[in-house]
Amino acid sequence: MATDNTKRKAAIIGSGNIGTDLMIKIMRRSRHLDVAAMVGIDPASDGLARAAKLGVATTHEGVQGLTRLSVFDEIDFVFDATSAGAHVKNDAFLRTLKPGIRVIDLTPAAIGPYCVPVVNLDAHLDAPNVNMVTCGGQATIPMVAAVSRVAKVHYAEIVASISSRSAGPGTRANIDEFTETTSKAIEAVGGAGKGKAIIVLNPAEPPLMMRDTVYVLSEAADRAQIEASVERMAAAVQAYVPGYRLKQSVQFDDIPANAPLHIPGLGRFSGLKTSVFIEVEGAAHYLPAYAGNLDIMTSAALATAERMAASLVNA
């Protein structure tokens, strides 16, 4: 295990729900990272108060404030949990001072390559900026990729249902970016010819856990092989998101050539339809257990940065 002297120092930009949960996760679970700074814009935010109480350097003056902290010179990793628009500016500003800094983007900005740890992290260990897609993407793209490993996927559609209470101002401000980024990543990372993403904010009380439905249209293939691939992938995600689970058995439907589906932008489809149903329970480090959508983002971001930091140690 890495000692405090060999751990890489990290800063978190965004002192809201995601940033605060990420800070606690790093403190409790990280082998290679140490939280050195928490950055916000609201001096009264709970995240900054908690960070200060835990001995972490704080600033409420945004990314400019981060660069004025004495610890900035030691920072190797930055997690950005702000918004898509803010991230573009934050990354550009940081690189004027530290061109080689590693940035883990938890917004839908996607100025770096999409990263879903169980699918394509190995290809991006040296990337200066990686994008964690979205909560829906982290939950569902592994399932699309699992089918892609067995059969050619022509189309994949995901529906992410999250509790309204777990959707903070950042999530709500990025709904359009959420659907666009997730759809593109379903194709680029999941391997689908065409992808579509839908997000549903569920106002139910008491709040429901995150649930995701994945529909995959592929060429005909061995159902047992697809099911086994899905189960292996779910187990791989569970390694860093323990609350991730298949809600029920994988379902299959044959779409015959004489009764094809019509997919907008794709045309007629016949082949195999695979349906996967997922539930994500949060670890409740800082956020409630129903906020699995936020937990999977912070867990995936930490898993990504851990591997990157470990690769630097072993280089």
From Swiss-Prot:
Superkingdom per UniProt: Bacteria
Pfam families found in the cross-reference section: AcetDehyd-dimer, Semialdhyde_dh
Top-level enzyme category: oxidoreductase
EC nos: 1.2.1.10
One Gene Ontology MF term: NAD binding
Active site: 135
Keyword Oxidoreductase among UniProt keywords: yes
Residues noted as binding NAD(+) in the record, renumbered to the chain: 15-18, 166-174, 293
Family: Belongs to the acetaldehyde dehydrogenase family.
Name of the featured protein: Acetaldehyde dehydrogenase 2
